């Protein structure tokens, strides 16, 4: 969600509260000195992260020298490691980099250092931060791409009292919406990445996380029957023009974030659809640009705020549903995150990684908005509204967590995007598209 600047008194109260909690170093364990820390965050996110680190600095006496490296932090960090000048600690945005650094012996084994704190995370998150059975990282920030956003007023117009919990219910609700004169979906396409995110959710929910990871590694081919199932399942929704605002042809030019505006327009305009899919960052588009939407009252899966047309309009989301036959995959989540690793093992680095593994810093950023933590010890009360709370609870409760395939597929991600746009143009041409994708995966991944 959109980072929000809170009054100084509120931020001060948060910092004072955090200073007294358990994972901030006490005066008797002050380390002093300094620790260098790299991450990708800048601007508002950097300000929020700095606020989150403030209790650590005040309690430990250690100065954190933070440096923003932007979205190319992986490249910058690799060069620094190769040149023998890495930072003490870094937050990196994918598990692949952690695996590479651990294999090279460039980051510290945290298994014993975090022996009392690793239980703050579910097994799915600890597995993603491990290499050869040893823990090498701490997931400080998560992102949830398991979210379908809906306009409660449009659901109410079709007498739909609660969002769907299964894929079958989603298809049924689409029919119910159409019968009431409401178009079900605004399908974001842009240059292809939102369609890829959508398809990957369908694959995860139908095939499961193990198969998903095998497809990512290309140990499962793109011609596998599980891929076909995902395509045919997705076609149940996007293969019918009347399900989409603008139809299939119009959806091909549905750029982000304009696709969100079709469900959550500015005051004075009417919605063109009831639902839109994309990650948790959609909330920024719903509440920004002088819009006046308020978060729903119960977060994921529940009833929403009032649908009285004279009242303030609201928004909500539900978790991307699995088919009822694949209900075991319901809590599997596709997304992203930032994992902290130690490149120089010093007392200051160890103190900082312990702090990042605890709930205090994450709770501060959570209260500021635009943040979700997979840490089980971050209290639900830290989140400013029911929607952000629901997003975070889904991360914490994930049975498995996978990263977007197009973030892990080497140089052929843009080919993948185009392939999925080609599928949208002709949903019956699955076998040809699968064969093309498998050839591209072989060329892009080298196997």
Please provide the spans of the model-predicted regions.
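Extracytoplasmic/periplasmic solute-binding protein
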Residues: 136-140, 146, 171-220, 229, ...
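Long, aromatic- and glycine/proline-rich binding clefts that accommodate carbohydrate-like moieties
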Residues: 318, 366-418
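Conserved N-terminal structural module of periplasmic/extracytoplasmic solute-binding proteins
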Residues: 4-8, 12, 19-99, 364, ...
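Hinge/lid segment of periplasmic solute-binding proteins
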Residues: 93-146, 171, 317
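Conserved C-terminal helix/tail region of periplasmic/extracytoplasmic solute-binding proteins
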Residues: 156, 393-447
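Extracytoplasmic/periplasmic substrate-recognition and gating elements
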Residues: 281, 290-371
């Amino acid at each position: 969600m959109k980072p929000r600047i809170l009054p100084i008194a509120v931020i001060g109260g948060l910092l004072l509260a955090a200073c007294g909690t358990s994972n901030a170093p006490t005066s008797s364990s002050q380390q002093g000195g300094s620790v260098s820390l790299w991450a990708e965050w800048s601007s508002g996110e950097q300000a929020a992260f700095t606020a989150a680190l403030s209790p650590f600095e005040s309690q430990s006496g250690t100065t954190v020298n933070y440096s923003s490296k932007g979205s190319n932090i992986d490249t910058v960090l690799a060069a620094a490691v190769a040149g023998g000048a890495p930072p003490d600690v870094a937050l990196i945005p994918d598990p692949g980099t952690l695996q590479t650094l651990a294999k090279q012996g460039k980051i510290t084994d945290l298994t014993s250092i975090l022996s009392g704190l690793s239980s703050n995370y579910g097994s799915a998150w600890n597995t993603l931060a491990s290499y050869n059975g040893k823990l090498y990282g701490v997931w400080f920030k998560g992102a949830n791409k398991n979210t379908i956003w809906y306009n409660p007023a449009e659901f109410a117009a079709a007498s739909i009292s609660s969002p769907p919990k299964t894929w079958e219910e989603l298809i049924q609700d689409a029919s119910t919406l159409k019968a009431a004169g409401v178009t079900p979906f605004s399908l974001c396409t842009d240059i292809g990445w939102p369609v890829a995110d959508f398809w990957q959710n369908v694959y995860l929910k139908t095939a499961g996380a193990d198969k998903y990871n095998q497809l990512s590694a290309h140990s499962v081919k793109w011609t596998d029957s599980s891929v076909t199932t995902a395509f045919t399942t997705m076609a149940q929704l996007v293969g019918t023009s009347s399900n989409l605002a603008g139809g299939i042809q119009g959806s091909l030019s549905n750029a982000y974030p304009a696709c969100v505006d079709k469900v959550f327009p500015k005051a004075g305009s009417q919605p063109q659809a009831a639902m839109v899919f994309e990650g948790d960052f959609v909330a920024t588009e719903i509440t920004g640009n002088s819009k006046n939407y308020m978060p729903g009252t119960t977060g994921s899966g529940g009833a929403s705020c009032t649908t009285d047309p004279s009242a303030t309009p609201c928004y909500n989301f539900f978790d991307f549903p699995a088919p009822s036959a694949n209900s075991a995959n319901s809590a599997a989540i596709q997304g992203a995150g930032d994992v902290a690793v130690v490149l120089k093992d010093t007392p200051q680095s160890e103190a900082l990684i312990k702090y990042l593994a605890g709930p205090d810093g994450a709770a501060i950023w959570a209260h500021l908005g635009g943040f979700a933590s997979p840490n089980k010890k971050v209290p639900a009360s830290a989140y400013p509204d029911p929607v952000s709370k629901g997003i975070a609870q889904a991360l914490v409760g994930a049975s498995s967590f996978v990263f977007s395939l197009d973030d892990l597929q080497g140089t052929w991600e843009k080919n993948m995007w185009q392939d999925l746009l080609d599928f949208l143009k002709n949903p019956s041409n699955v076998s040809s598209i699968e064969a093309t994708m498998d050839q591209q995966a072989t060329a892009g991944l080298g196997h």
